[in-house]
Regions:
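Extended, low-charge, aliphatic-rich alpha-helical segments
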Residues: 153-176
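Hydrophobic-cavity lipid-handling domains and compact docking modules
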Residues: 1-113
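Short acidic, glycine/tyrosine-flanked loop/strand segments centered on an H-E-D-like triad
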Residues: 94-141
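A generic hydrophobic-segment detector
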Residues: 129-132, 150, 158
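Surface-exposed loop/turn and secondary-structure junction residues enriched for glycine/proline
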Residues: 79, 83, 144-145, 175
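Acidic, low-complexity glycine/serine/threonine-rich segments
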Residues: 136-153
Length: 176
């Protein structure tokens, strides 16, 4: 039986320490509940939310598993300037542990680009992310995305097509 009160929420697969606090009234109403944690304490600066689902409560700790990462629109908007092209995409990939993930990458070019360059960037992004996700487990994908490793690899790959000023994964969500 869980007593009512304030609990620390942990996501052991993503972060070392607590990610947020949660008021718990009953165990029944808490398990399976979605939580939103600000990424400013985990990642590099104020940039988005980490979405999780509570899976268990033990020893005055609430344990959650990751469901998604979303960036704030204002974070992305800071990099968009006149004379640049913003490229968005959305597709579903499968991880090595057969979990379906919806990926929404966003890229901002240094200058305005033609449709052929736009298409080439989207195609290269899809190919790279589908291949990378197929080789890694879901938790590793979340960790790499959270720490910016996946974005660095993607940006390096896309530099061969066209120079980018910004390359991020805007949303990474677990599909049902």
């Amino acid at each position: 039986m869980v007593r009512e009160g304030m609990y620390e929420v942990y996501m052991p697969l993503i972060a070392e320490g607590e990610i947020t606090n949660l008021i718990v009234k009953s165990e029944k109403g808490t398990l399976g509940r979605k939580i939103f944690a600000d990424l400013s304490s985990i990642a590099r600066g104020k940039l988005g939310n980490l979405i999780g689902k509570i899976t268990e409560i033990k020893d005055d700790k609430v344990i959650a598993e990751p469901l998604g990462i979303t960036l704030y629109a204002s974070y992305i908007q800071r990099f968009v300037r006149r004379g640049t092209t913003k490229i968005d995409d959305s597709f579903v990939c499968e991880s090595a542990d057969k979990r379906k993930l919806r990926v929404k990458p966003v890229m901002i070019t240094r200058k305005i680009v033609k449709r052929s360059v736009h298409s080439a960037l989207v195609r290269e992004t899809r190919d790279f992310l589908e291949k990378s996700f197929a080789e890694a487990k879901m938790n590793d994908i979340f960790l790499e995305t959270l720490h910016g490793e996946m974005q660095r690899k993607l940006s390096k790959k896309l530099k061969r097509v066209y120079p980018l000023s910004f390359c991020e994964i805007r949303e990474l969500l677990v599909e049902k």
